[in-house]
Amino acid sequence: KDGGKNWTKMTVNQLPGVPESAFVNDIKADLFNENVAYIALDNHKFGDYKPYLLKTTNGGKKWTSITNGIPDNTLVWRLVQDHVNPNLLFLATEYGVYISFNQGDKWHKFSNGLPTISVRDLAIQKRENDLVLATFGRSFYVLDDYSALRDISESSLEQEGILFQPRTALQYQPLIGGTSSQGASFFTSKNPEYGALIRYYVKEDHKSTKSKRIEKEKALKATNIPFPGWEALDNEMVEAGNEAIVVIRDMDGNVIDQLVKPLKKGMNHVNWDLKQPFGTTVNANSKRKTIRTWRFNVKGGTYTAQLYKRVVGETTQLSDPVSFEVKRIRTNVLTNPLANETEAYTQKLMALSKALSQTEHAFYKASKQLE
């Protein structure tokens, strides 16, 4: 507490519940409170794979175990604290990453695409709010812009759905499809998708009627399984899949786009490409009745995103609208003096395209009837 002039010795066996043979993997001082610190230890060299993770709130005088939610056979390696929200902690373990929203009182497994691997180190890139993971022999992983996690608490996880604040979306024209002429020396990872990244949380899965029936039949494995009936099976075949829907609107409340993904429990994300559907045209000459959709760039400004779910054909609102900005990536250039005129012309062209599509479809149906 005096800049390193004086030290107080503390041995491992002074920590409650920690064997004296345990090895100290990490010690972290709290970024916001000088009396709070965290320590991670392991004793696997002696056949002990328990997680030893402790916290002090009085400068090391007393330590308390904070392993609620971490399985008994999970070694802990590193801990990092968010630099904005003091309650948000990340923990690297032998079997992936865990996250806490209340300073370690409770931990949650945080996989979301991360394989079950040994994560040995963690670092936070503060400028971009990225979480960087180093694994044991399985490369590096980066969680891009985790700032949405700062808005989560244990109580908010009980909500049916949450849509998080998107960051400002920068608008530009991508010119290359992600690769170049590097031949055999081409090694790369995917960049974040172009557009507005929208993250959302869904509390529960909603299983289809077929999935529920199959679960019941599994429980009847040792007995005769009743036949559900042809009508019930037909209804299962035509039942619409459960979906999460993010509706994009402009500030006038006009629907600009709808982003649809399968409804899944936990943290999810969808990417809006900052474009608006131009219109659809039914190709009447095609046996497949192909529907072609064009999309054009939206103008910069304020937009809103709102989360819905569709379960067995019924749509329910899960969140209030959340606003975000769309801006040009280059701000030191001249603006288009005809932007409003271009927008009005595009809207007129969209209406004309829609009318043309409807006319073409009506003509196609009439011609089929005459045949």
What do these predicted ranges mean?
Residues 153-371:
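Extracytoplasmic/secretory ectodomains and luminal regions
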Residues 1-186, 193-194, 203-205:
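Beta-propeller blade termini and top-face loops
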